[in-house]
Regions:
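Well-ordered alpha/beta subsegment
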Residues: 47-87
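Short, conserved beta-strand/beta-arch hydrophobic-aromatic motifs that form part
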Residues: 1-46
Length: 87
């Protein structure tokens, strides 16, 4: 993982590998949709945890990646909110 990593609390939801490659942690349904629509690639090491990979070389890829990062962040917020209300 690079120093360009994004967290919500202690949960890492995205991190870069170089200037154009990013891994993003999605919910399982989000992961399935991103893979089915070909806006993300299978993560090499941790697909079972919801991770996908994106390569950013075009404006369209950048826009799709931004949407996935937003989904990942929103999932983190939702998980934290659910965890707090369960206490």
């Amino acid at each position: 993982m690079s120093e360009e990593a994004y967290f919500y609390g202690l949960r890492n939801f995205a991190h870069f590998h170089g200037p154009r490659h990013i891994d993003i942690r999605l919910s399982k349904p989000q992961q399935e949709e991103a893979l089915k629509t070909h806006i993300a690639l299978h993560h090499q090491y941790a697909p079972q945890a919801g991770w996908v990979s994106c390569v950013i070389e075009t404006v369209e890829q950048a826009e799709n990646t931004k949407l996935l990062i937003k989904q990942a962040y929103d999932t983190c917020v939702s998980l934290k909110t659910r965890f707090k209300s369960a206490k």
